[in-house]
Amino acid sequence: MIKDTNRYRPARGTAGLALLLLILLGCAGYYVYAGYYRHDIFRELPAADAGPERPAIVMLSGDMGNRVGMTPKVAARLNARGYAVVTVNSLSFFSPRRTATEAAALIGGAMHRAEALGKTSEVVLIGQSFGADMLHAGLAEMPTAARRQIRAVVLVVPGHDIIFRASPIELAGLETPDALALPTASRLTWVPVTCIRGAGEDNSLCPEMDMPNLRKVDLPGGHRLNGDDAALTAAILPAIVQPRSE
Protein backbone atom coordinates (compact mmCIF):
# COMPACT_ATOMS: atom_id res chain seq x y z
CA MET A 1 0.00 0.00 0.00
CA ILE A 2 1.42 3.40 -1.03
CA LYS A 3 1.13 6.12 1.60
CA ASP A 4 0.32 9.68 0.69
CA THR A 5 3.47 11.48 1.88
CA ASN A 6 2.32 14.88 0.64
CA ARG A 7 -0.76 15.34 2.76
CA TYR A 8 1.06 17.12 5.61
CA ARG A 9 2.97 19.56 3.43
CA PRO A 10 0.22 22.19 3.28
CA ALA A 11 0.12 22.21 7.08
CA ARG A 12 3.87 22.76 7.29
CA GLY A 13 3.67 25.46 4.63
CA THR A 14 0.84 27.18 6.47
CA ALA A 15 2.82 27.07 9.70
CA GLY A 16 5.83 28.60 7.94
CA LEU A 17 3.75 31.41 6.51
CA ALA A 18 2.18 32.06 9.89
CA LEU A 19 5.61 32.25 11.51
CA LEU A 20 6.83 34.65 8.82
CA LEU A 21 3.73 36.79 9.31
CA LEU A 22 4.33 36.90 13.06
CA ILE A 23 7.94 37.97 12.50
CA LEU A 24 6.89 40.72 10.10
CA LEU A 25 4.18 41.91 12.48
CA GLY A 26 6.70 41.92 15.31
CA CYS A 27 9.14 44.01 13.28
CA ALA A 28 6.38 46.40 12.27
CA GLY A 29 5.24 46.69 15.88
CA TYR A 30 8.77 47.43 16.99
CA TYR A 31 9.18 50.23 14.46
CA VAL A 32 5.82 51.68 15.48
CA TYR A 33 6.98 51.68 19.10
CA ALA A 34 10.38 53.16 18.22
CA GLY A 35 8.79 56.00 16.28
CA TYR A 36 9.04 55.15 12.59
CA TYR A 37 5.39 56.14 12.12
CA ARG A 38 5.72 59.68 13.46
CA HIS A 39 5.84 59.55 17.23
CA ASP A 40 6.53 62.82 19.01
CA ILE A 41 9.88 64.18 17.88
CA PHE A 42 10.98 65.59 21.25
CA ARG A 43 11.11 64.18 24.74
CA GLU A 44 11.83 66.59 27.58
CA LEU A 45 13.52 65.67 30.88
CA PRO A 46 13.34 68.67 33.23
CA ALA A 47 15.74 69.01 36.16
CA ALA A 48 15.19 70.61 39.55
CA ASP A 49 18.78 71.90 39.53
CA ALA A 50 18.46 73.53 36.11
CA GLY A 51 19.55 77.14 35.82
CA PRO A 52 21.83 79.59 34.03
CA GLU A 53 24.97 78.21 35.68
CA ARG A 54 24.78 74.90 33.80
CA PRO A 55 24.04 74.03 30.18
CA ALA A 56 21.00 72.19 28.93
CA ILE A 57 21.54 69.15 26.74
CA VAL A 58 20.15 68.14 23.36
CA MET A 59 20.58 64.52 22.27
CA LEU A 60 19.87 63.37 18.72
CA SER A 61 19.12 59.65 18.84
CA GLY A 62 20.36 56.97 16.52
CA ASP A 63 18.24 55.49 13.76
CA MET A 64 16.33 53.30 16.25
CA GLY A 65 14.74 56.34 17.90
CA ASN A 66 14.94 57.80 21.40
CA ARG A 67 12.97 55.05 23.14
CA VAL A 68 15.57 52.29 22.80
CA GLY A 69 19.34 51.94 22.77
CA MET A 70 21.89 54.19 24.46
CA THR A 71 20.15 57.55 24.04
CA PRO A 72 17.43 57.14 26.71
CA LYS A 73 19.89 55.56 29.14
CA VAL A 74 22.54 58.26 28.78
CA ALA A 75 19.86 60.96 28.87
CA ALA A 76 18.55 59.53 32.15
CA ARG A 77 22.06 59.48 33.65
CA LEU A 78 22.73 63.09 32.66
CA ASN A 79 19.31 64.16 33.90
CA ALA A 80 20.02 62.47 37.25
CA ARG A 81 23.08 64.71 37.53
CA GLY A 82 20.86 67.77 37.33
CA TYR A 83 20.93 68.60 33.63
CA ALA A 84 17.78 69.38 31.68
CA VAL A 85 17.73 67.16 28.60
CA VAL A 86 15.79 67.20 25.34
CA THR A 87 16.08 64.04 23.26
CA VAL A 88 15.24 64.04 19.55
CA ASN A 89 13.69 60.99 17.89
CA SER A 90 15.78 60.83 14.72
CA LEU A 91 13.79 57.84 13.47
CA SER A 92 10.56 59.85 13.51
CA PHE A 93 11.95 63.04 11.99
CA PHE A 94 14.17 61.43 9.35
CA SER A 95 11.80 58.64 8.30
CA PRO A 96 11.17 60.71 5.19
CA ARG A 97 14.38 61.80 3.52
CA ARG A 98 15.53 65.20 4.77
CA THR A 99 18.17 67.77 3.86
CA ALA A 100 21.01 69.34 5.81
CA THR A 101 18.98 72.55 6.00
CA GLU A 102 16.08 70.68 7.57
CA ALA A 103 18.49 69.04 10.01
CA ALA A 104 19.76 72.50 10.98
CA ALA A 105 16.20 73.68 11.61
CA LEU A 106 15.53 70.61 13.76
CA ILE A 107 18.64 71.27 15.85
CA GLY A 108 17.69 74.92 16.26
CA GLY A 109 14.21 73.99 17.45
CA ALA A 110 15.60 71.45 19.92
CA MET A 111 18.04 74.06 21.23
CA HIS A 112 15.24 76.54 21.93
CA ARG A 113 13.31 73.85 23.80
CA ALA A 114 16.36 72.89 25.83
CA GLU A 115 17.19 76.50 26.73
CA ALA A 116 13.65 77.08 27.97
CA LEU A 117 13.57 73.77 29.83
CA GLY A 118 16.95 74.34 31.44
CA LYS A 119 16.47 78.08 32.10
CA THR A 120 19.85 78.69 30.52
CA SER A 121 21.45 80.25 27.46
CA GLU A 122 23.97 77.45 26.86
CA VAL A 123 23.47 74.01 25.35
CA VAL A 124 25.59 70.95 24.70
CA LEU A 125 24.68 69.03 21.55
CA ILE A 126 25.13 65.25 21.49
CA GLY A 127 24.50 62.99 18.51
CA GLN A 128 24.38 59.18 18.73
CA SER A 129 25.33 57.19 15.60
CA PHE A 130 22.89 58.33 12.88
CA GLY A 131 22.11 61.31 15.11
CA ALA A 132 25.81 62.24 15.15
CA ASP A 133 25.84 62.22 11.35
CA MET A 134 22.80 64.49 11.21
CA LEU A 135 24.23 66.73 13.94
CA HIS A 136 27.43 67.75 12.16
CA ALA A 137 25.66 67.91 8.79
CA GLY A 138 23.02 70.23 10.24
CA LEU A 139 25.49 72.40 12.14
CA ALA A 140 27.36 73.06 8.91
CA GLU A 141 24.20 74.82 7.67
CA MET A 142 23.43 76.70 10.88
CA PRO A 143 23.84 80.50 10.82
CA THR A 144 26.70 81.90 12.89
CA ALA A 145 24.36 83.84 15.17
CA ALA A 146 22.51 80.64 16.11
CA ARG A 147 25.73 78.93 17.18
CA ARG A 148 26.55 81.25 20.07
CA GLN A 149 24.62 79.23 22.64
CA ILE A 150 26.47 75.98 21.86
CA ARG A 151 29.01 75.12 24.56
CA ALA A 152 30.20 71.85 23.03
CA VAL A 153 29.41 69.21 20.42
CA VAL A 154 29.73 65.48 21.11
CA LEU A 155 29.68 62.99 18.23
CA VAL A 156 29.10 59.43 19.45
CA VAL A 157 30.11 56.70 16.97
CA PRO A 158 29.63 58.87 13.85
CA GLY A 159 29.99 57.11 10.51
CA HIS A 160 32.29 57.59 7.55
CA ASP A 161 29.37 58.67 5.34
CA ILE A 162 25.93 60.26 5.66
CA ILE A 163 22.42 59.15 4.75
CA PHE A 164 19.65 61.70 5.30
CA ARG A 165 16.98 59.09 5.92
CA ALA A 166 16.38 56.67 8.80
CA SER A 167 14.63 53.49 7.71
CA PRO A 168 14.87 49.69 7.95
CA ILE A 169 16.73 49.78 4.62
CA GLU A 170 19.29 52.26 5.98
CA LEU A 171 19.62 50.24 9.19
CA ALA A 172 20.39 47.11 7.17
CA GLY A 173 23.12 48.96 5.28
CA LEU A 174 21.32 48.72 1.95
CA GLU A 175 20.86 52.46 1.33
CA THR A 176 23.29 54.36 -0.88
CA PRO A 177 25.13 57.09 1.09
CA ASP A 178 24.27 60.68 0.25
CA ALA A 179 27.67 62.15 1.10
CA LEU A 180 30.94 61.63 2.93
CA ALA A 181 30.94 62.82 6.53
CA LEU A 182 34.35 64.48 6.79
CA PRO A 183 33.63 67.61 4.69
CA THR A 184 30.90 68.80 7.08
CA ALA A 185 32.40 67.43 10.31
CA SER A 186 35.71 69.16 9.62
CA ARG A 187 33.89 72.51 9.53
CA LEU A 188 33.21 72.32 13.27
CA THR A 189 36.22 74.50 14.05
CA TRP A 190 34.25 77.06 16.06
CA VAL A 191 33.27 74.88 19.04
CA PRO A 192 34.89 72.22 21.26
CA VAL A 193 34.20 68.83 19.69
CA THR A 194 34.40 65.37 21.23
CA CYS A 195 34.40 62.34 18.92
CA ILE A 196 33.73 58.98 20.59
CA ARG A 197 34.17 55.66 18.84
CA GLY A 198 34.36 51.97 19.68
CA ALA A 199 37.93 50.67 19.68
CA GLY A 200 36.88 47.75 17.48
CA GLU A 201 34.69 49.83 15.20
CA ASP A 202 35.02 49.94 11.43
CA ASN A 203 33.80 52.81 9.25
CA SER A 204 34.23 55.42 11.99
CA LEU A 205 34.59 59.11 11.25
CA CYS A 206 36.70 59.82 14.34
CA PRO A 207 40.11 58.67 12.98
CA GLU A 208 39.63 60.90 9.94
CA MET A 209 39.08 64.06 11.99
CA ASP A 210 42.09 66.21 12.89
CA MET A 211 41.35 69.61 14.40
CA PRO A 212 42.93 71.55 17.29
CA ASN A 213 39.55 71.82 19.04
CA LEU A 214 38.95 68.05 18.88
CA ARG A 215 39.04 65.53 21.73
CA LYS A 216 38.99 61.87 20.71
CA VAL A 217 37.83 59.06 22.98
CA ASP A 218 38.07 55.32 22.28
CA LEU A 219 35.76 53.06 24.30
CA PRO A 220 35.74 49.25 24.44
CA GLY A 221 33.65 47.41 21.89
CA GLY A 222 32.39 48.08 18.42
CA HIS A 223 29.73 50.45 17.16
CA ARG A 224 27.41 49.62 20.08
CA LEU A 225 30.16 50.28 22.67
CA ASN A 226 29.26 47.01 24.43
CA GLY A 227 26.04 48.69 25.53
CA ASP A 228 27.95 50.38 28.37
CA ASP A 229 25.95 53.55 28.94
CA ALA A 230 27.86 54.32 32.16
CA ALA A 231 31.19 54.43 30.30
CA LEU A 232 29.67 56.52 27.52
CA THR A 233 28.23 59.00 30.01
CA ALA A 234 31.63 59.31 31.69
CA ALA A 235 33.23 60.03 28.30
CA ILE A 236 30.65 62.72 27.54
CA LEU A 237 30.77 64.56 30.88
CA PRO A 238 34.07 66.46 30.36
CA ALA A 239 32.54 68.19 27.33
CA ILE A 240 29.57 69.29 29.44
CA VAL A 241 31.38 70.58 32.51
CA GLN A 242 34.22 72.40 30.75
CA PRO A 243 33.31 76.03 29.98
CA ARG A 244 33.58 77.06 26.37
CA SER A 245 36.70 79.12 25.66
CA GLU A 246 36.06 82.11 23.43
Question: What feature does the model see in each segment?
Answer:
Residues A145-D161:
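A conserved short beta-strand
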Residues V157-N213, V217:
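The feature captures the conserved acid-bearing segment of alpha/beta-hydrolase catalytic domains
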Residues G13-Y31:
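Hydrophobic membrane-insertion alpha-helices, especially the h-region
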Residues Q128-F130, V157:
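Catalytic nucleophile serine of serine hydrolases
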Residues M1-R12:
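N-terminal Lys/Arg-rich, disordered targeting/topogenic segments
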Residues M70, P96-G118, V123-L125, D133-A137:
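Alpha/beta-hydrolase active-site loop
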Residues Y36-Y83, T87-L91:
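Short, surface-exposed "cap/lid" segments of acyl-processing enzymes
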Residues M209, L214-E246:
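C-terminal catalytic histidine-bearing segment of alpha/beta-hydrolase fold enzymes
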